[in-house]
């Protein structure tokens, strides 16, 4: 087939006509460029189909005509991985926010309360944002996400107790992070026929990544040192300083 192509930033577009008689095609992007998202739209269809291609792997055969046959399990596993990798390893701002929740206290109850509030909140706005019920530009959402990191780090310096307002604040920040997740999933693309399955899988992937972040942090620090008298001074406070400074940097960067 003859194609015209254009590249802008990290988006590469190709369009054209396929050679008659070819039932399907595959796509592969060089492994040196890392993982990529392939979005396919046919001229006779408004709906776009997305494929997650990890580290240069070749796509499955994509029919030239008609919708591709994809099982529920295929779609679920694809968006589960996308949700997980959006946090680990690519979502450093979300990782630092979750670490801020973890570093508040060595007790399990405050952590569970915060993580539950955050999870419920981002699940709500992820769905509503993807449905188009709520829409805020990234120029507003992204700076506010950075501000949430600064706030969590600053409050953790002041107390190691779960204040009465903390769950509500975390819930509010979770709503913002959910809009960020929705923006990412919207860019990736989600076919209408796969909407519910893909949305649930992506959200579960995000939650599993959050659990992984907390588990890694606990195994690296909490398991060994949380009962030490110097735990907050030598581990928590330096970590909060890094988290707060990173959040402040992103806040300025995203505003400018």
What does each of the following model-derived ranges do?
Residues 1-12:
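Single conserved hydrophobic/aromatic residue that forms the stacking wall/gate
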Residues 14-19:
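Short, hydrophobic beta-strand segments
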Residues 20-37:
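Short, surface-exposed ligand- or partner-binding patches at beta-edge/loop junctions that are enriched
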Residues 38-74:
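Extended, hydrophilic extramembrane loops/domains of integral membrane proteins
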Residues 68-90:
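Cytosolic-side membrane-insertion boundary helix
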Residues 86-256:
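Hydrophobic alpha-helical transmembrane segments in multi-pass membrane proteins
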């Amino acid at each position: 087939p003859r194609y015209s192509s254009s590249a802008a930033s990290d988006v590469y577009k190709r369009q054209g006509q396929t050679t008659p008689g070819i039932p399907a095609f595959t796509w592969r992007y060089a492994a040196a460029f890392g993982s990529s998202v392939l979005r396919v739209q046919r001229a006779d269809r408004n709906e776009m189909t997305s494929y997650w291609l990890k580290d240069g792997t070749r796509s499955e055969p994509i029919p030239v005509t008609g919708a591709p046959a994809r099982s529920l399990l295929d779609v679920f596993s694809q968006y589960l991985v996308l949700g997980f990798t959006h946090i680990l390893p690519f979502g450093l701002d979300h990782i630092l926010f979750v670490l801020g929740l973890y570093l508040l206290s060595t007790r399990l109850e405050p952590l569970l309360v915060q993580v539950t509030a955050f999870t419920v909140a981002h699940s709500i706005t992820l769905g509503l944002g993807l449905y188009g019920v709520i829409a805020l530009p990234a120029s507003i959402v992204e700076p506010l996400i950075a501000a949430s990191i600064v706030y969590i780090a600053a409050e953790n310096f002041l107390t190691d107790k779960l204040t009465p307002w903390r769950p509500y604040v975390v819930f509010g920040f979770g709503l913002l992070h959910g809009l960020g997740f929705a923006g990412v999933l919207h860019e990736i693309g989600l076919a209408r026929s796969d909407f519910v399955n893909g949305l649930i899988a992506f959200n579960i992937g995000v939650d599993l990544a959050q659990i992984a972040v907390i588990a890694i942090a606990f195994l690296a620090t909490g398991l060994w040192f949380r009962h030490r008298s110097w735990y907050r001074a030598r581990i928590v406070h330096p970590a909060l300083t890094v988290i707060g400074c990173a959040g402040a940097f992103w806040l300025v960067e995203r505003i400018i």
